[in-house]
From Swiss-Prot:
Sorted UniProt keywords: Cell cycle, Cell division, Cell membrane, Cell shape, Cell wall biogenesis/degradation, Glycosyltransferase, Membrane, Peptidoglycan synthesis, Transferase
Entry superkingdom: Bacteria
Recorded catalytic activity of this chain's protein: di-trans,octa-cis-undecaprenyl diphospho-N-acetyl-alpha-D-muramoyl-L-alanyl-D-glutamyl-meso-2,6-diaminopimeloyl-D-alanyl-D-alanine + UDP-N-acetyl-alpha-D-glucosamine = di-trans,octa-cis-undecaprenyl diphospho-[N-acetyl-alpha-D-glucosaminyl-(1->4)]-N-acetyl-alpha-D-muramoyl-L-alanyl-D-glutamyl-meso-2,6-diaminopimeloyl-D-alanyl-D-alanine + UDP + H(+)
Protein name: UDP-N-acetylglucosamine--N-acetylmuramyl-(pentapeptide) pyrophosphoryl-undecaprenol N-acetylglucosamine transferase
Annotated residues for binding of UDP-N-acetyl-alpha-D-glucosamine: T10, G11, G12, N123, S198, I251, Q296
Pathway the protein acts in: Cell wall biogenesis; peptidoglycan biosynthesis
């Protein structure tokens, strides 16, 4: 199997692609070519993963009228020429996009050249690039039930798959008792994990800092992942803390300790929600208000509606409100966990590869 993969800009587009690639490699001999940009995170992440990487020069379309969009149009045409050569040289069986503006010229060119094509949409609300590409590709893989209508007349091309990142988390061998022991947490105390993303989230951090005096009066444990940039300031603010409240700037193997937790406080990015539902974790979601079309709040809605999560908008976030939400979630943990697990799609990577193989066989 020869496959070209494109997706980039943020980890939310890259890590699902890598999860899919690893599942393909596990199941069948394959050759992979990844097409991204040098400015996106994919240039480093994909190369570090040992996957052949080629870059094109492309930028995103601005939603307002701008001369930059004219320049983007020229870059798009230039990229089409380069992608055409890369595809002719590599001769893939299928071309897959996982989101980000880099997918635009790659999947568009592949479809026009007659290659089988699929795009994977991680969010409930699709981005501009994937909505554009839906007109040309053979299949659109969805991560959230009910999001197909956003593709309009191309809804018939959609298939519910889930986020491949979930499959990697599902396959981890995790001993919750051992994970708590590593951090020095007592087994019989409910553990809350706060994670605002790799850079941290200042609004979440402030609310947690404000909540900690009340938290010390409970029997809860807290793992507070602040983000590298904020760690020293928060450490100075809080001073000496009891052992059951721990600060970390960042955690590389976060899913391991998540499995040992009873509640997670986080943003509602697509990969985060895939991890939470695969592990069946209750959550308090605080969507980022800084993302396109408020898609994180749309992502969170399916978890909130089924009782798997509580939602607090950042504009309404305070330490007291967060503490009250924690109290409710800890009390309702069993029901929220059951609802969360019911939304999980742990076989997403395998199901996605099955769909790729079906598309390839149809060609033949």
């Amino acid at each position: 199997m020869r496959i070209v993969v494109s997706g980039g800009g943020t980890g939310g587009h890259i890590y699902p692609a890598l999860a899919m690639i690893r599942e393909i490699e596990r199941r069948t001999p394959c050759e992979v070519l990844y097409i991204g940009t040098e400015n996106g995170l994919e240039a480093d992440i994909v190369r570090r993963a040992g996957i052949p990487f080629e870059s094109i020069e492309i930028s995103g379309i601005r939603r307002s009228l701008s001369f930059e969009n004219v320049k983007t149009g020229f870059r798009f045409l230039k990229s089409v020429v380069r992608v055409r050569k890369l595809l002719r040289d590599f001769q893939p069986d299928i071309v897959v996009g996982t989101g980000g503006f880099v997918c635009g010229p790659v999947l568009y060119t592949a479809a026009k050249m007659g290659y089988k094509t699929l795009v994977h949409e991680q969010n409930s609300l699709p981005g501009i690039t994937n909505k554009f590409l839906a007109r040309y590709v053979d299949r659109v893989a969805l991560s959230f039930k009910g999001s197909g209508h956003h593709f309009g007349k191309n809804k018939g091309k959609t298939i519910l798959i889930g986020n491949p990142r979930a499959s990697e988390v599902a396959m981890l061998q995790i001993d919750p008792v051992e994970e708590k022991r590593k951090y020095g947490f007592e087994q019989d105390r409910p553990l809350i994990v706060v994670y605002g993303g790799s850079r941290g989230a200042p609004a979440i951090n402030k609310a947690v800092v404000d909540m900690i005096p009340k938290l010390t009066e409970t029997d809860w444990s807290l793992l507070f992942v602040t983000g590298q940039v904020h760690y020293e300031d928060i450490q100075a603010q809080l001073g000496t803390l009891p052992d059951r409240i721990q600060l970390r700037p960042f955690i590389y193997d976060l899913p391991l300790i998540l499995k040992a937790s009873q509640l997670v406080i986080s943003r509602s990015g697509a990969s985060t929600l895939a991890e939470l539902t695969t592990l069946g974790l209750p959550s308090i979601l605080i969507p980022s208000p800084y993302v396109t079309e408020n898609h994180q709040e749309v992502n969170a809605s399916s978890l909130v509606e089924t009782g798997a999560s509580l939602l607090i908008r950042e504009s309404e976030l305070t330490g007291d409100r967060l503490f009250d939400a924690c109290t409710k979630a800890i009390a309702d943990q069993a029901d929220m966990s059951k609802a969360s697990l019911a939304l999980g799609m742990p076989n997403a990577a395998s199901d996605l590869v099955d769909e790729l193989l079906r598309l390839i066989q149809r060609k033949n």
